[in-house]
Amino acid sequence: FDRHIAALEDELEEGRTVEFNAMFMDRYLWNLQFGSSRIVPKKRASGAPIDGVVVSAGIPELDEAVALIESLQADGLPYVSFKPGTVDQIRQVVRIAKAVSPITIMVQVEGGEAGGHHSWEALDDLLAATYAEVRACDNLVLVAGGGIGTPERAADYISGQWAHAYGLPDMPVDGVLIGTAAMTAKEAHTSPEVKQLLVKTPGIPTDAKSDDVFAPQAAHWVPSGKSVGGMSSGLSHLHADIYELEN
């Protein structure tokens, strides 16, 4: 951890900072990072360029989330994000936002076409079902992700025009999450072999008909335990659904 932070400090321009992504469901790592060992807040206190935390792989209960946000703020980590993948989880983040107002937090809504750990609900469905509730919170920043791999698709969400397909008015988000596409960028330290494999993996064509009767019309699933288009859907060490390259 210390070695990677030192390397990060060498790479970042002066004044640039990063957010630390932590998996809430991985209790060993969570306790190491923010529990009894507190290696992340301690590293921040020593001057590391970390100014926020992304809480992924689960949403804490309300009381725990409020205490966490207050603790992180006190530790000099003002930017706190939660990454829900279901309607219920988004509404939990809304409750958290109301409880900590006027502190601003971020909700990173991630749909079922995201790489790695993923939801079984489509991004558009998640946004359409909760948009009004999220926007009713002045202290909640809305970010969307999962299957956004091109500038044009990102622009649809930033402008809000993604909602037109459902007969809805513009529903713009404040930002987008880019994961898999960023891994293939020239600047990424991903190994060349992995980059090539990502590029060559065909995936599921956007006009393909899904065999999964539960798949939303706007989404393209790889059914659990199966492989489609060079991608497989399995379970991670957290017993959570995860997409992986078939290699």
What are these regions (language model features)?
Residues 134, 141, 153, 158-247:
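Conserved active-site-proximal phosphate/metal-binding subdomains
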Residues 85, 112, 147-148, 180-181:
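An acidic- and aromatic-residue-enriched active-site/binding cleft used to recognize and process polar
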Residues 116, 144-152:
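Gly/Ser-rich catalytic serine loop of serine hydrolases
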